[in-house]
Amino acid sequence: MQDVKVWDLFVRLFHASTALVFLLNYFVTEDGSALHSYLGYGLLALLGLRVIWGFIGGYHARFKNFMPTVAGVKEHISAMFFGEKDDHLGHNPLGALMVFNLLGSLALLCTTGILAETDMFWGMKWMEDVHEFLANYVLISVALHLLGVAFETKRSKINLVKAMITGKKNMPLN
């Protein structure tokens, strides 16, 4: 096994900050409070920076380098099902799908939160309902993400949590 640098500091700080802001807004702040709004705007700013970093960041941070394909997803699922070795230095295909799922759903969550505060949508229950649905959808996605990380860590014997903290994956020598 060999430590290989994968996740740059920006990606790791983005990941931790996004998780913290979402969890604070979901579990701690009061809906509609100033703090809830400020954290939502902060989350949107983080997402904007991550999109920029997805084009100019390091190799494994760039979207073009982990675009999932149907064939890649099928191969990865097959390897999981049949217990075959299928190590990925960056995101595996299912992990890549989850990245895009979370980035998109968090962006929609922020957008509906902002819209709910505008004159056009103020007090409209359906907008609040969409915002709440998206918050719950993100929470379920986060739970699935954590289950996927735990499963893949056990399956591959590569500690993905440690990799996100240190930026280095302990990869098998080929």
Label each PLM-derived region with a short phrase.
Residues 1-174:
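Membrane-embedded alpha-helical bundles that constitute the cytochrome b-like, heme-associated redox core
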